[in-house]
Amino acid sequence: MTANAHRTALFAIAPLAMALFFVGGPACGQNQPKPAHDKTFWRAIAAHRYQVPANETPFALAQELSSYLGSPDPELRDDLSYSILAVWIIRQQRFSPEELVQLNEEWTANLRDGIGQSGTDSIFKRSFSALCLSSLAERELKAPFLGLLRYRKLLDATLEYLRDEKDVRGFDATKGWIHSTAHAADLLAALASSPWFTKPDQAAVLNAITQRLAMANEVFTYGEQDRLANVVAVTASRTDFDLNRFQSWLAEMDAADQEVWKDSPPKLPALQRFQNDSYMLRAVISQLLQRPSTPALLEVQKSVLKALKRR
């Protein structure tokens, strides 16, 4: 081929290449995922009252934020990702019911990601997915989107998570809040406010709280008992509250806790359980005093105070 022929061929190809570049054909990577935004981008959103930037869609940003829930970076995970998602879900209601359902499915699945591990960074995805699910459950109370079947699945998944989570760390000086027990409690408190929450559910949740406190293998020191007490207070405030079942649950807890004094010195697991239960019951009293008084709540207070006097 002569030099002129080479030039002719190149000139013939050039317009096509330029067209692909500007139109956004495969050569320019239009179908490739958009690059992740840096923290400066997310800080700007938080600083501007959580407004969605121009040329961005809330759900696409939510999917990116969701991928950061497992980050060991406390600013990215907590201050930015969780905080932005919570505002967009509850206060600003940026997402359609279909999008909320999709987030619910993703975050519920995350509760099982690495379950059984302890002391690893896998905890962040599980714990902060539970916290984000609590925002969805709060949104559900204001504008229902889950439906009964999804609600039942979420409640079951939450109880399983509280039962199976082995990593109960509350806080890390470098990586920030971990708080798996507190976040699961926040989710249960929102779910316990639902009209779909039944009397058998009340019993299941109370038993899950007892089990969590008994199996923690430490005395909680980052407010976990307060968050679990809130679940008890929410349950006790329901119009269909099963007072008899509550009193049976409390008596069973109290009897189990008295076992601690059978050994001298007390065995550590029994002592940890005793302390966790005692702190939680004191927090229940505090929570109930902040709520409008009802005959049922007064009975709960009397029963809890009676149990505390025996400690």
Segments predicted by a language model, with ranges:
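Bacterial N-terminal signal peptides that target proteins for export
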Residues: 2-15
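Alpha-solenoid helical repeat scaffolds
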Residues: 64, 79-83, 128, 157, ...
